[in-house]
């Protein structure tokens, strides 16, 4: 029987591994900040393709990777879709008030 390749799971930093410099760098890009704002406004996970970003697929993938590796979002696969959710509780634990300050600016 032929084996079907399985996509690797996403890696996410643990709460104590989230670094302020990485979070601020990720939030410094207008497209990534837009993604975070949309995720903050939705309680349910959103598919990467549901964001109205005026960028190509590889750039979109890059932005989500930066957000995930910084610890801002958590991603999981749902069939062929990648669902993203904001790690609000983890960020509030690590950096109290930071996310609210950024989102209200």
Can you name each region flagged by the protein language model?
Residues 16-20, 83-105:
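Conserved segment of winged-helix/HTH DNA-binding domains
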Residues 49-72:
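Canonical helix-turn-helix DNA-binding module
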Residues 21-56, 78-90:
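N-terminal helix-turn-helix DNA-binding core of bacterial DNA-binding proteins
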Residues 29, 63, 96:
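Conserved acidic functional residues
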Residues 1-4, 92:
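Generic N-terminal simple sequence motifs
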Residues 75:
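Short beta-strand "wing" residues that participate in macromolecule-binding interfaces
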Residues 3-24:
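Short, Lys/Arg-enriched N-terminal segment that forms or immediately precedes the first helix
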